[in-house]
Amino acid sequence: TPIIIGTAEAGSTVELLNGDASLGTTTADATTGIFSITPSSELSEGLNSLTVTATDEVGNTSSASSALSITVDTTAPAQPSITTTTSLTNDATPTIEGIAEAGSTVTLFVDGVTTGITTTADGTTGAYTITPAELSDGAYALTVTATDTAGNISAASSALSITVDTTAPGQPVIATNIANTTDSTPTIVISADAGSTVTLYSNGTVLGTGVANSLVTITTPQLGDGDYDITATATD
């Protein structure tokens, strides 16, 4: 029920019409002719064509004004979705992708609190990407809503549960101490954070990998006679 404002003959009776249906009357200001009127009943969903007429004190009625076309949209957009499936990341500003009503404004929430960060869904496909401000290490529930051009807000999407971990594992330690060996495929024991993937190198060449359970054992491929500089990295 929008407020309609206009001007008419001073002191005249202004009638608001939606097509042929009357939506009420008001009196134009006796000096300025300015009037405001609120429809006496709610406008129907969709396109409405509003006009006004003015009737003077002796009953003469003007022709109708030019039409004001108003589209009423009280229907909220469909619930948007998040298509990103990443649950663990070392990116503190992960890019979130999904689908929302085409052309709608997508708003990002973290743990149910709006971030104020928005983006516009593609006008044809509804695809969107949105990125939060930098997140601290920890677990989060990310959701989005879609707002259409009429201001209707959708229900929140299903939550994406995501854990941010930007902390590198502790430095692995090679526990095996073999300065000299006759074994051309030596077994190397490495101490590393449980669950981390340990990669064994010799002069930059990968010799093998394994998953640590505090310790991990890696047997090298066949090595020729010579000196080797053995190192290890751990990736969580």
List the predicted regions and their residue ranges.
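Structural beta-strand segments of beta-rich domains
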Residues: P2-I4, A92-I96, S184-I188
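Short proline/glycine-enriched turn/loop motifs at strand-loop junctions of beta-rich domains
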Residues: T7-T13, I99-T105, S191-T197
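Short strand-edge motifs at loop-to-beta-strand transitions and within beta-strands
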Residues: G33-I37, G126-I130, S214-I218
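Surface-exposed, short loops/turns at beta-strand junctions within beta-sandwich domains
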Residues: P39-L47, T131-A139, T219-D229
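Flexible, low-complexity linkers/stalks enriched in Thr/Pro that connect modular domains
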Residues: D56-S62, S66-P77, N90, D148, ...
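Proline-enriched interdomain boundary motifs that mark the N-terminal boundary
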Residues: T75-T84, T167-T176
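Short, solvent-exposed loop/linker segments at the N-terminal edge
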Residues: T86-A92, I178-S184
